[in-house]
Each structure stands twice: as structure tokens, then as C-alpha cells.
């Protein structure tokens, strides 16, 4: 966390905008008047960036897709639940977290559809915040690992890369496809001036774009 806070402080000095491409939090759910305990310094740093005139956008990832009005109204973050196409530094960019893209992992796709459904969100909101937050944190907890990427991460990386290359081929107006989710950084020039980039992760690689 301290390294991330130092990086945010540096960002405040030199960035014109900041886009966080999902899974900033291991678990996030906003009840009507309660948010998960913790993340205080990170949230304060993000609010500080916004107060200094640096726009902050956050793409919901598979761990923190349930963002809402606390992030947007109290912190000032623009929260996005779905992929977007935007002009970034002269590049027409497709920006997505990356979960659910590519072939395979049918079980996760089904779970993702259920978890993102309105009924699931409503039902989860009926749980007591202490129980709901503990349950969500337990299910979505990211384990710190030693060594290289796991087989599952390599599989996700391959699937998302294959999807991204196909998307660049399908839409010639795109210059850049940016994803996360896989935890494996990657920069690939598909053809002159057109790229697929995976920002990797902060926990293991301290990587960013």
C-alpha cells in the first residue's frame, strides 16, 4: 500500500489523468450507508488527486465491479462498469478490465453473469454489512504468491491476448487495446502504430501504463 501511495503522489505531480483498470480493491460493495472498512489512505489519495484537478476514472474489475455512489460522489471518481472506447494521448483505445473476454472458462462466465445480476446485488445488499463484507472478502481474496505466474494466470493471459488481437483486426479504427485481469504485463506491437497492452498488476509487478 505504501508503494502505491507513493506512486499516486508522483502521479499527482505529472499526470493529466489517471485510469485504474479494475481490481483496485480485493473486494468492494457499497451498502446504502456503509462501505468496507479499510482502504482509507488509498481513497484519501484518490480524492486528493481529484481535488488537485487530476481526473480519476476506475474500471470495475471482477473484484470491485460493485462500485457505486460512494466512489463517484464522495471520492469524485468516474466509475465504469463496462469497457469503453476513448481517445488517449492520440490513440483510439479500447479499455477493458479483461475478465470474461476470450474463449474458455465457461464456469466463470456463468458465475460472472449471476454475480453481476440485479437480483444478486439486491440480495447481497440485504445481508448485514459485517457478514456480507466478510463473505465477499473471503471469496475474492487475492493470495500473494512467490515465483512466476500460475497456470491459471498464463491461461487467462493467452485467452485475453487472443481476444485483443482479434479485436484489433476486427476494428481497424483502434490503435490500442488495454486490458488487465491476467496479472501478467504485456506490450505487443501488432502492426506499426497498433498495440495490445496488458498493464499487469501492482501486487507482484508494480507495472502500469
Label the model's feature ranges:
Residues 12-15, 46-49, 84-88, 108, ...:
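Short, surface-exposed, polar/charged, turn-prone segments marking secondary-structure boundaries
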Residues 1-88:
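Core catalytic region of metal-dependent phosphoesterases/phosphodiesterases
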Residues 27-48, 143-177:
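N-terminal short leaders/motifs
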Amino acid at each position: 500500500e505504501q508503494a502505491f501511495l507513493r506512486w499516486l503522489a508522483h502521479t499527482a505531480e505529472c499526470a493529466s489523468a489517471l485510469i485504474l483498470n479494475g481490481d483496485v480493491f480485493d473486494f468492494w460493495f457499497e451498502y446504502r450507508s456503509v462501505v468496507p472498512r479499510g482502504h482509507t489512505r488509498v481513497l484519501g489519495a484518490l480524492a486528493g488527486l481529484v481535488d488537485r484537478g487530476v481526473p480519476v476514472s476506475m474500471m470495475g474489475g471482477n473484484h470491485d465491479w460493485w462500485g457505486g455512489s460512494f466512489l463517484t460522489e464522495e471520492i469524485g471518481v468516474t466509475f465504469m462498469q463496462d469497457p469503453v472506447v476513448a481517445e488517449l494521448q492520440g490513440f483510439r483505445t479500447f479499455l477493458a478490465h479483461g475478465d470474461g473476454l476470450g474463449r474458455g472458462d465457461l464456469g466463470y462466465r456463468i458465475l460472472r453473469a449471476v454475480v453481476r445480476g440485479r437480483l444478486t446485488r439486491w440480495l447481497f445488499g440485504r445481508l448485514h454489512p459485517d457478514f456480507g463484507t466478510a463473505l465477499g472478502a473471503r471469496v475474492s481474496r487475492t493470495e500473494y504468491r512467490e515465483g512466476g505466474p500460475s497456470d491459471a494466470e498464463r491461461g487467462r493471459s493467452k485467452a485475453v491476448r487472443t481476444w485483443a488481437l482479434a479485436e484489433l483486426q476486427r476494428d481497424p479504427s483502434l490503435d490500442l487495446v488495454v486490458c488487465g485481469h491476467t496479472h501478467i504485463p504485456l506490450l505487443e506491437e501488432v502492426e506499426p502504430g497498433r498495440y495490445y497492452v496488458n498493464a499487469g498488476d501492482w501486487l507482484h509487478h508494480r507495472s502500469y501504463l
